Amino acid sequence: MQKLNFMERSDFNGRSEVVKELFGKSDGACVTPPFYCDYGSYIEVGKNFFANYNCTILDVAKVTIGDNCFMAPNVAIYTAGHPIYPDVRSAMWEYGKEVTFGDNVWIGGNTVICPGVHIGSNVIIGAGSVVTKDIPDWAVAAGNPCKVLRMITEDDKRRLFRDEEIDDEAWAEICQKLGW
């Protein structure tokens, strides 16, 4: 991890090799330093994983991230927790709960994912969210605590943002690339 954090930003091949060492594979993974984790060996990422600046993954339990998942700057994924009762907590007890992401997940900046959370496939989590509970497939969710705001539908295919459609030329190119 230290090696990754001190590499030249332009050394994409070197960063890819370090990511492969850290996660056991890279397969199109890109991690923009600085990046922090407890071990790295409990983190499994799918194809085309992207973590922007200052990603923190406390991996005392397994973290499984699907294909095509993107994390904006300052995303934190926590698997570690501590007992509620003060005397037990002060004895330095810790537990870990797995965190999982499906495929095609986009996590907005400054978001915290708490221990034990499962985020489904094709999900967007809005910036600044604190995710304390599972999020179903095809959801747009945000807030503190994070809640489902709406579901992603076919109507969203041509949308860049809520009220802005992709122009016809770009749409034709997208359809061609996707084989639609």
PLM features per residue range, with description:
Residues 108-134:
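Beta-rich strand-turn-strand
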